Amino acid sequence: MNALTAVQNNAVDSDQDYSGFTLIPSAQSPRLLELTFTEQTTKQFLEQVAEWPVQALEYKSFLRFRVGKILDDLCANQLQPLLLKTLLNRAEGALLINAVGVDDVKQADEMVKLATAVAHLIGRSNFDAMSGQYYARFVVKNVDNSDSYLRQPHRVMELHNDGTYVEEITDYVLMMKIDEQNMQGGNSLLLHLDDWEHLDHYFRHPMARRPMRFAAPPSKNVSKDVFHPVFDVDQQGRPVMRYIDQFVQPKDFEEGVWLSELSDAIEISKGILSVPVPVGKFLLINNLFWLHGRDRFTPHPDLRRELMRQRGYFAYATHHYQTHQ
């Protein structure tokens, strides 16, 4: 098995015409595609979902799929297959999504509706214990006293996968920028597993398949530890990861040293992408073969960034991990 997968240069068909949105490769990598909903599509979508406040989407989970169908219908039913094809394609698996005209914090509810529609065209977003909803909104400020690196602005949040400390499978992660004030820096950091120079070394190490304990801090509202290996394989035998440096709890010297070396090898990778995400845009990535993090911010007394996340599972046939369910 070859752990590395070449990028397909023709992954995006430049001659393809889509209804309601455009699709182009990003400036950072052909693996990351930029999808932009047209002004007309955005306007029509927001008009058609205006009758449902965000609270309705929280209380009635089937409405999340309803708004997804509305968006897909406005795109001539080309959106859903395109999203699934991209996210399941090992050579891509990541989208930066934008809706023309949705770019102000005053439109925060509209942003949640749009992101919810997109997410529920590919699967379903899991319950987020930190917020008590299917999504979480949180703020990064200049001073932080929380119990994880999620809100700490003046340091790099290291690359990781989401869903490492919960039992639910986390196939996708959606990260949306709702507001930003007095900000410099803080780009999203992404690393595709197949662009990581040290993948083969760590994937083939005996420690790679050893179940390890993952435990979350109190702010996550998750009290039960979970056990799983850092690496697994998909149905085609390709490496996937469930890893975060903050929450893995090595049981002994051997595990601790290996995890420390693994973390260093990830952070020095030349394959890391630095991606600016303006207000109103969101990243949607395959969580099994993309790692994500955040660069540091320049200090400012009035620094503020508000983010929204959703993470969940793909709703299609058989998938997930091959060996460790």
From Swiss-Prot:
Pfam families: CsiD. The keyword Iron applies. One of its GO terms (molecular function) is glutarate dioxygenase activity. GO terms for biological process: L-lysine catabolic process. CDD domains: CAS_like. SUPFAM superfamilies: Clavaminate synthase-like (SSF51197). Its cofactor is Fe(2+). Signal peptide: none annotated. Acts as an alpha-ketoglutarate-dependent dioxygenase catalyzing hydroxylation of glutarate (GA) to L-2-hydroxyglutarate (L2HG). Functions in a L-lysine degradation pathway that proceeds via cadaverine, glutarate and L-2-hydroxyglutarate. Homotetramer. This is Glutarate 2-hydroxylase. It comes from Escherichia coli O157:H7. The gene is glaH.
